[in-house]
Amino acid sequence: MLKYNIHFSIGFFIFVLSAMPAMSADIVNDKSIGMELARDIATEAVLACRKKGYNVSAVVVDRFALMRAALRDDLASRFTLKIAKRKANLTVMAWSDSGTFRKARPDIQQELNNINGLIVMEGGVKIVSGGYNIGAVGVSGAPGGDKDAACAKQALQKLQERIEFAIDN
């Protein structure tokens, strides 16, 4: 009887282990930007533009285009927040900086601009950590999307080491 129980226990244990890979597909682990890093990227982007004399807003979204941080400089227009978020959303949708996407796909720019939450303008930059797209930052308010993008990239450059090691591979 004891021999039967041991064999049954071993067999049951092997059955449970063999079922685990099939069950693992039911759980998805994602790698996305955390609140503190998002806050610091938004802050650095606004400060980078402020040093150049531009009053901007910066919005950081996670890989699902959910807002993680938003910051509007004291004299930035209130509309810059919405535009910055829409730029970041486009970046997440395309997984390409919004300026790069704008140049590559002028044929669908008008259609995308009519989708709620998106705008095809320069100023959205993807955030990559450990080879994973973890979010995007959108900046709006400088006189030109190229200047918005430069402030976003400057913020990412300043926090580059922290961003790169945010995800453990």
Regions from the PLM with identified roles:
Residues 1-10:
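Bacterial N-terminal signal peptides that target proteins for export
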Residues 24-169:
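Flexible, solvent-exposed loop/hinge segments and secondary-structure transition points
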Residues 13-15:
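Hydrophobic alpha-helical segments of integral membrane proteins
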Residues 19-21:
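N-terminal signal peptide c-region/cleavage motif recognized by signal peptidases
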